[in-house]
Amino acid sequence: MRFSAIFTLGLAGTALATPLVERAGSSPTDIISGISDKTDALDSAIKAYNGGDPSKVESASADLISTITKGTDAIKSGDDISTTDALALPEPVQALTKKVEQAIDDIIAKKDKFVEAGAGGKVKDSLNQQKSAADGLASAITSKVPESLKEIAQSLSAGISTAIQKGVDAYKDVSDSAPSSSAGSSASATATGSASETGSASTTGSASATSSSVIPTSSGAASSSAAPSGSSTPTGSGSASATSPPLATGAANKATIGYSLGAVAMAAIAVAV
C-alpha cells in the first residue's frame, strides 16, 4: 500500500495538467484488465480440476500466455505511457498480482493430481512460459513510463513474475516428459545341459546254461545288443535285463568252457573243409 502511494504521489504533480486520452483496448489498464480476466478463467479451471484430462487447464493457460504476449506487443509497439496512464496502473496491477498468487497457490495444491495424470511436465512448461511472458510485460511497461518512474514501475509489475516463480519452484522436480516408459529388459539365457549318459549296457546272458548244454544253441545263449540311441545313451537290451552284476556260478563256468570248446570245434570244421 505504501508503494502504491509513493507511485501515485510521484505522478500527481504532472497528472493534473495532462488530459486523459483513452486508447480503447490498447491502454495499459485495458491490457491489464484483459490479463486479469484470463487469470480468473485459468484459476477457475484449476479449481475444477480433480484428475484425469487436464485439457481445460492447459487451454486456459495457453489463453493467458497468448493474452500477455499480445498485450506486451501492443505496449512495445505503442506510444510511451503517459503520466495519466501510469497513474492508473498501480491498483489494477496489484489486483492482478493477488489473482496470480491465488492461481499459483491452487495449481501447487493440485500438483499431485496433475502428476498422476501425466501432466506435471506440461504444467511446469506452462508456468515457465507464463513467467517468461510476465517478465516481458514488466519490461515493456517499464520501458514506456517516464524515466523518473521506471524503477518504481519495474518493481510494481515484477510482483506478477515473483508470484509465478513460486509455482515454477514448486514444479521444478517434475519430469519434463509425461509418460513414463517401463522398459524392463530381462535376459533369461538358461542353458540346460541334459546330457545324461546312462550306461546301461548290461550284457545279459539269457541262456540258461546247464550241464547238459555245453555248446550254445541257435536260440542265442548270450545276446549282447548295445543299441546306441539318439540321446547318446548306450543301452544294452537282452531278452531279460539284469540290473545286478552277473553272479559267478558253476553253471557260468561251464558255459564259458562250452563257448571255448564250441569255438575250437568250429575252427576244426573250418580247417577240415
From Swiss-Prot:
It is found in: Secreted, Cell wall. Gene3D superfamilies: 1.20.1280.140. Residues 173-247 are annotated as: Disordered. Residues 1-17 form the signal peptide. One of its GO terms (cellular component) is extracellular region. Pfam families: HsbA (PF12296). Constitutive protein of the cell wall. Antigen target of host humoral immune response. This is Cell wall mannoprotein 1. It comes from Aspergillus flavus.
